[in-house]
A protein has these predicted regions:
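Helix-biased detector of long, well-ordered alpha-helical tracts
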Residues: 1-199
């Protein structure tokens, strides 16, 4: 555990300045991080006409947890992707820091994509129209064979630690270009309009 903390601190250039321990039957970690920012991107800044993007794809954490709990036999490359999504998630911090000046609103997806989209819609007082499911073909094929629900895996999985963000249309080219430079997949999943809720 200590080595894991050390590795994460080195990778994300942060320091542990304190902590407290207690006794219990389960292992629980609560972490709080403080930092400075010259621009804070909130959950509530989206505007009518903004595009909705995610880094991604989604759904592998649901499958990874299913593999761990049920010991399912699937293709090796799909196992690797899914287990990595659960046991070693990688927040897209470089991408977020490089592009936050273009975002009108943003939130991480650790509580699930559906929860994130609904929270951003509520905070912005705007309707979010979702017209694309941010998943990969290999995942879709497997879930279909297993008669598992794609929407549930993608929108209600959680623990992906991806960025969900809105941008004015004029910045689409630059954020896509920056994603390619950093080799980070991003997916346009919808748009913002007048109204309430996620549709």
């Amino acid at each position: 555990i200590a080595n894991g903390f050390k590795k994460a601190c080195k990778e994300y250039k942060i320091s542990i300045i304190g902590g407290d321990t207690n006794e219990g039957k389960e292992i629980v970690f609560n972490v709080c991080i403080f930092g400075n920012s010259n621009k804070i991107v909130t959950r509530k800044g989206s505007n009518k006409g903004d595009a909705i993007f995610t880094t991604g794809p989604f759904g592998y954490t649901s499958l990874g947890l299913d593999i761990l709990l049920k010991n399912n036999r699937i293709k090796k490359n799909l196992i690797k992707k899914s287990l990595k999504a659960v046991t070693n998630p990688k927040p897209r911090l470089d991408y977020g820091l490089k592009n936050k000046k273009y975002f009108t609103s943003a939130m991480d997806s650790s509580d699930g994509l559906s929860t994130t989209l609904n929270e951003m819609s509520k905070q912005s007082k705007k309707k979010f129209i979702i017209n694309k499911i941010p998943s990969n073909k290999d995942l879709e094929i497997y879930l279909k064979k297993q008669k598992m629900d794609l929407n549930s895996a993608v929108f209600h999985g959680g623990e992906e630690y991806e960025f969900v963000f809105t941008i004015p249309l004029k910045y689409k080219k630059i954020i896509i270009k920056n994603a390619k430079l950093l080799k980070i997949p991003i997916i346009e999943i919808g748009y913002v309009t007048i109204g309430k809720g996620v549709h």
